């Protein structure tokens, strides 16, 4: 897993996020080192859905970390509407995007990623629900009121409801991609 790989290549005057072609050249160098050892690269990045970074990763032949799934499942379970979750699953299939999907991780529950797939009001509702259950909003790069993720275990985010957790896990396991089970979910 290559955390925040898109920030690695730096150039004066550039955005310094997914600089192209530098990011892909760096990944190719790492891949050449890793392949003789049978290692696969898993580029990890948080970015809004609307940026389509996951598509760029897939176009380069890499598996991508699915940071959309955790929030989409919570949204579906809390709203009773799985339209966005089903749409995401169909997009993975239609575009042949290979993912490792997860529910929880050491970073908490990613929400910045949902911009462009869920309306801002729905994202805010998710934030409010998770915060009401003990979650803590982590702002983007220390900027106030620009959310990045909510720090909470997935079980806590679901209100410690065992039925919701079981359904969330089943959805994760049967989603396109390889499920990653985190020990603190």
Residue ranges and their predicted role:
Residues 1-185:
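Active-site and adjacent substrate-binding regions of carbohydrate-active enzymes
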